[in-house]
């Protein structure tokens, strides 16, 4: 759509104004995103568009900014996930299987995969019994990465967390 508009404009001043306005709009859109996965897809699409017309080259820089911001968001999630895992394993212990999953997928993705495989597993209830719900994979996914799981799974997590009697923590998730 953008390329079609750009090709229709014969005046280069109007075309460059369109590109500048589009760059500004995209930069505003980028920093409103909190989902690194969607942001990377957006960056890919922006880059593809930037290669289709000579006047659209400034969009490549915007795509690079989007990619950098997505990486920054991912690293923030990994730092939080690492702390959740550290505190949770101090309380509950760590299995070899989970360590292997951490090495293979990274901290945040390991927590998401744990929740995808089983919501409310025995480790969840062990941490609940020790009043450490904030260190569960379910709590992490519900609070920080709801975009990484399906809506059905997210509803299941919210139902599970609503059965726990720790209202101050549950307000953080909702």
Model-derived regions, located:
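A short structural micro-motif
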Residues: 24-25, 49, 117-122
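Short, hydrophobic/amphipathic alpha-helical patches that form generic packing surfaces
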Residues: 41-48, 97-100, 110-116, 138-143
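Amphipathic alpha-helical packing elements
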Residues: 84-130
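Contiguous, amphipathic alpha-helical segments that mediate oligomerization or scaffolding
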Residues: 36-39, 52-65, 69-88
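Charge-centric, low-complexity intrinsically disordered segments used as regulatory activation/interaction regions
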Residues: 3-6, 47-54, 76-79, 172-173
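Amphipathic alpha-helical binding modules
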Residues: 62-63, 67-73, 91, 117-119, ...
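Short terminal alpha-helical segments
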Residues: 1-27, 71-91
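Charged, low-complexity interaction regions
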Residues: 12-19, 27-41, 50-59, 89-90
